[in-house]
């Protein structure tokens, strides 16, 4: 079936329209930033510079290239703390494979017989839902799945969080709803001897101010959703880090060692979550991404203004189409929906033929979308700082053509 009469010709937007994404042609409309954001040119440049100019190991050498790596890594740690509004006196920053790995690192090394229950919510990514399942069994404690309100708040009682390991997302990857009662939740958890671990994978580029207002015990997020390379980051309170019973150990973690014991370097606490050689290019790329995020103005607007404008266009445009069911109750840069007229996977394929890249399925949130809500597969449109008004108008036009012609 040929739904479209003609295809867009391949061309490039002007530098003022795409700025640091000039390598993205107008023919390509990428709408999967909730999975992985595109990398702006300064990030690519920083990584190439590392590979070409000082491609060495960090943390273990005395020569100049290695010292440059060490300085760049520490600069990135400082940039992470600044982005989430935390002090190096209270928190450490460690680099891992991804958000999932970071969450597993923390959860699987928590001490036994300290916490009496584990709490998560129904609208969690599998990177939270599965590890909380396995760690509750490992620690022999009950696991409770709580509801989230429409505004993203966690619905709980004080008994629910007493002595609890609470692991929830700060921002949903389905519809962008945020943990509105995060501060009250954190107070209740800490007053009852519990800990709060946040999945911040979707938060760093949208509303990092929420993270700054919450005294979380650990935060895990992904560089690759923050305009950096594929990398995970853990921001952890020193007190929690010191309590971990380490089982993921190896190179770069030794101050002293004998046949049956070892001690960690006193001047590098984060090494307890960083066994082995690190992805130095990735860490340097993340530092460049955070520097870029601090100053980038898409189409002359603030990032928030730009994102809100496109999100409203997308939400209002889809709302006008027939037989479309939008999960979002308000505009968001992450928007999910389904159509009565065309299956989400077919819709994604039709869009792909027009070089529009959108995600279809359940977005690793199977429990909430399939078990709780019993939705059919969904289509998710997630906007990034590279997107333009033209992108949104084109997508809305093409979705309308598909729905009209598929009947």
Model-identified regions with their sequence ranges:
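Pyridoxal 5′-phosphate
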Residues: 1-407
């Amino acid at each position: 079936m040929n739904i479209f009469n003609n295809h867009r010709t391949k061309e490039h937007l002007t530098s003022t329209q795409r700025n640091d994404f000039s390598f993205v042609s107008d023919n390509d409309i990428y709408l999967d930033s909730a999975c992985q954001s595109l990398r702006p040119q300064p990030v690519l440049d920083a990584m190439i510079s590392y590979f070409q100019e000082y491609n060495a190991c960090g943390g273990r050498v005395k020569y100049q290239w290695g010292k440059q790596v060490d300085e760049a890594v520490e600069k990135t740690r400082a940039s992470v703390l600044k982005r989430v509004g935390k002090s190096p006196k209270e928190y450490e920053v460690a680099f891992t494979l991804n958000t999932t790995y970071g969450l597993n690192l923390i959860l699987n090394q928590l001490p036994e017989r300290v916490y009496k229950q584990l709490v998560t919510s129904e609208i969690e990514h599998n990177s939270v839902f599965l590890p909380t399942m396995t760690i509750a069994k490992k620690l022999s404690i009950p696991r409770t799945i709580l509801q989230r309100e429409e505004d993203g708040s966690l619905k709980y009682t004080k008994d629910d969080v007493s002595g609890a390991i609470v692991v929830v997302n700060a921002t949903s990857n389905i519809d962008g709803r945020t943990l509105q009662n995060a501060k009250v939740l954190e107070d209740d958890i800490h007053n009852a001897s519990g800990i709060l671990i946040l999945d911040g994978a979707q938060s760093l580029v949208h509303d990092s101010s929420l993270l700054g207002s919450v005294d979380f015990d650990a935060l895990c997020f992904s560089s690759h959703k923050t305009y950096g390379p594929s990398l995970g980051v853990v921001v952890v309170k020193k007190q929690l880090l010191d309590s971990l019973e380490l089982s993921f150990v190896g190179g770069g973690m030794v101050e002293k060692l004998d046949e049956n014991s070892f001690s960690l370097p006193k001047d590098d606490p984060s090494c307890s979550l960083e066994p082995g050689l690190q992805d130095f290019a990735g860490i340097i790329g993340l530092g460049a991404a955070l520097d870029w995020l601090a100053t980038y103005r898409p189409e002359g607007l603030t990032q928030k203004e730009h994102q809100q404008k496109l999100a409203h266009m997308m939400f209002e445009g889809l709302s006008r189409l027939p037989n479309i069911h939008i999960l979002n109750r308000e505009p968001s840069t992450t928007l999910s929906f389904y159509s009565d007229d065309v299956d989400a996977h077919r819709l994604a394929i039709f869009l792909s033929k027009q070089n529009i890249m959108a995600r279809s399925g359940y977005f690793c949130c199977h429990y909430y979308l399939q078990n709780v809500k019993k939705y059919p597969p969904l289509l998710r449109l997630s906007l990034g700082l590279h997107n333009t008004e033209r992108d949104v108008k084109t997508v809305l036009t093409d979705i309308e053509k598909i729905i009209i012609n598929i009947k």
